[in-house]
Design a protein with these regions (language model features):
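Right-handed parallel beta-helix/beta-solenoid
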Residues: 88, 111-112
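A cross-family glycoside hydrolase active-site/sugar-binding cleft signature
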Residues: 2-4, 39-41, 80-84, 108-110, ...
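Conserved, mostly hydrophobic/aromatic
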Residues: 38, 69, 82, 107, ...
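N-terminal capping/lid subdomain adjacent to the active-site entrance of alpha/beta enzymes
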Residues: 1-80, 86, 90-93, 97-101
Length: 185
């Protein structure tokens, strides 16, 4: 089971979201409660527009978060790196390759999720499995993602993807393509 990282009691939220050390403390605490993965998204600030090149400071901050969290949890938990579909293809590749030494379990929507060509390019260039699907709605969309090799971890949102019955169909397609499911609830 995974959890997002949140400030612990006594931590100031404004400081937490920019502090690798505080996030590492939160991650260690989550692991002590039995979580086996922690999700975080330090590459912001995020905007309503996607497809931009992350600044070197965004990459450096993201690497610092991954390093601190990995050191805090060791091999007791996986790292789940979210991006909210914010990067250009080149930017997503640049960011993903910088994160590879920390072995995240997934790289969530590194480019806008409706840009299948770009997501496929990122999946081929980065050694972190791409996760996607919270904004996809139909099994046809998930089928296209799988056929293109754009993501190895599907994240359909139960309500958006048509409920339990459709989610089971998406899971069957994922199994055929040797992909994993991590529903976005």
């Amino acid at each position: 089971a995974y959890t997002y990282l949140y400030p612990l009691e006594g931590m100031k939220a404004a400081e937490f979201w920019v502090s690798p050390e505080m996030s590492a403390q939160s991650a260690a605490e989550a692991v002590s409660r039995g979580y086996t993965a922690v999700k975080f998204d330090p590459a912001g600030p995020y905007t309503i527009r996607g497809g931009h090149m992350p600044a070197m400071s965004d990459i450096s901050r993201s690497v610092a978060f991954c390093k601190a969290i990995r050191e805090a949890v060791g091999d007791r938990a996986d790292l789940l790196f979210g991006t909210h579909g914010q990067f250009s293809t080149a930017g997503a590749i640049r960011m993903g390759q910088a994160l590879e030494p920390y072995s995240p379990l997934w790289y969530e929507e590194p480019v806008p999720p409706d840009d299948l060509h770009s997501m496929t390019a990122v999946a081929r260039a980065v050694r972190i499995p791409v996760a996607a699907g919270e904004r996809l709605s139909t099994k046809a969309e998930f089928g296209a993602v799988l056929r293109a090799g754009a993501a190895e971890i599907l994240q359909p949102a139960l309500g958006r993807a048509g409920g339990i019955w459709e989610m089971k169909k998406i899971a069957a397609m994922a199994e055929v393509h040797n992909a994993q499911m991590a529903p976005h609830l």
